[in-house]
Amino acid sequence: MKRFSILLSMSPDSGTVPARALDTLEAALSKGYAVFVFLYEDGVLFARKDRDTPQGEIDLVSRFSSLSTHPNCDSVACITASERRGLRNSSLLASVRFGGLGEWTESLSSS
């Protein structure tokens, strides 16, 4: 199976770039790729299950949550970035786990 790695470092509220990143993630999964998603810096906010989206805005967290449950998707939130933003196990999406930058670099070598 072909592998694809993507790093999300922007918050879900950062304009159209995060939506396009999710479009890319969805396309890779639909084409049968095994996808590794690394959430870094403000990107860890995609993993917050209790995040509220303002009325009238697209809920990218729910969209990411749905994509991250795909059997070929491995989603990892940077533990250090998560701690800096108050993200703990109790507020983490069930389909996302904590990990370190080493996992990102390993994923790049196999993608």
Residue ranges and their predicted role:
Residues F4-A19, A47-D52:
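Short, glycine-rich nucleotide/cofactor-binding loops
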Residues S5, F36-F38, V76:
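A structural signal for isolated positions on well-ordered beta-strands in alpha/beta enzyme cores
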Residues S9, Y40-D42, T80:
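Cofactor-binding loop segments of dinucleotide-utilizing enzymes, especially the Rossmann-like FAD-
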Residues V17-G32, V37:
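Histidine-anchored nucleotide/phosphate-binding helix
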Residues V44-A47, E83-R85:
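Short, active-site-adjacent cap segments at secondary-structure transitions
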Residues D50-Q55, S91-A94:
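Short glycine-enriched, charge-decorated loop/helix-capping segments at active-site entrances
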Residues T53-R84:
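A glycine-rich helix N-cap at a beta->alpha junction
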Residues R85-S111:
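C-terminal structural segments of small proteins and small subunits
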